[in-house]
Amino acid sequence: MEEDLLRRAADLAERCERTATVTSTAFLTPAEQYALTNWARHRDCTLVLHGGGEGCERRAAFFLPFYLTAEDFDPAEHLRAVHFSAPFGAPGHRDYLGAILGLGIRREWVGDILVQDHGAYVFCLPSVAPALLELEQVGRTGVKAAAAE
């Protein structure tokens, strides 16, 4: 598994350098982040990990082109957040994750799921956000989804 990740990272770093555009992985587990960070230390590339919010456990890795510093990088251009409100119930993390995976969305396309009273924030890749916005039920609870700012 780690070998596949590092091979993919090498491809993304090379594409970033060749095209001078930001490239990124899907969301990574903490172990994958550790392996990738160690790999990047021995390469001539700028790697930034971001999960969409402060303190996120699952984060995507972004390879930055020569003209972009980590301080200038805006992850909001490459990640999305969807807010779910559940006024008549309080679904848990497992309920949200089950509903999302039930849509056919792979786990690595979704970052952290921050459950709050009567709602949750879900960080995801931009390609997944439209499907999440269509979600109307989590567990046995009706929900309303909206793009978070």
What is each model feature region?
Residues M1-E149:
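Non-catalytic terminal extensions of ATP-dependent helicases
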